[in-house]
Design a protein with these regions (language model features):
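Short helix-capping/hinge motifs at transmembrane helix termini and TM-loop junctions
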Residues: 36-37, 44, 75, 110-111, ...
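Hydrophobic alpha-helical transmembrane segments of polytopic
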Residues: 14, 18-25, 54-64, 92-99, ...
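Mid-chain, well-packed structural core segment of small domains
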Residues: 71-106
């Protein structure tokens, strides 16, 4: 396998890892929106059961993150379809890098030890994987 093929495998693998992690995030957000009392691991860990406004926020976030997973998979060359036109995939991928960078910082400074323990490594992995996809893809 030459270096071009190795780079393509790396990018596809990174894209798949990011998509799986986003899938876990989407599932978590859907469960929060449904009222599962896991709020201590989200939104600063203020309440086990989220109030209605945060449940709605989780529902919206689940949809947005699912769409971003498709963008990452498209940028990584795993799928040919995404919810955005091809010309927007690059800029949207950089927006995602920015979101994961912010998420990593916020998860590092959250007052919730549980949220930090779960989501700091996840957000850092999503940031690293998305950077691989964007820079090498």
């Amino acid at each position: 396998m030459d270096s071009t093929e190795q780079a393509a495998v790396l990018v596809r693998t990174a894209g798949l890892v990011v998509a799986v992690l986003i899938g876990a995030l989407v599932a978590f957000q859907v469960l929060l929106a449904a009222g599962v009392p896991w709020g201590r691991a989200a939104y600063g860990g203020q309440a086990a059961e989220l109030p209605a406004n945060l449940r709605v926020s989780s529902a919206v976030a689940a949809v947005v993150w699912a769409l971003f997973a498709l963008v990452v998979l498209r940028r990584a060359g795993v799928t040919a379809w995404s919810p955005l036109p091809a010309a927007w995939i690059g800029p949207a991928s950089w927006v995602l890098v920015g979101l994961f960078a912010v998420a990593t910082v916020l998860n590092a400074i959250t007052p919730s030890a549980l949220e930090r323990a779960i989501w700091l490594p996840v957000s850092a992995l999503m940031l690293a994987g998305t950077l691989v996809v964007v820079l090498r893809g």
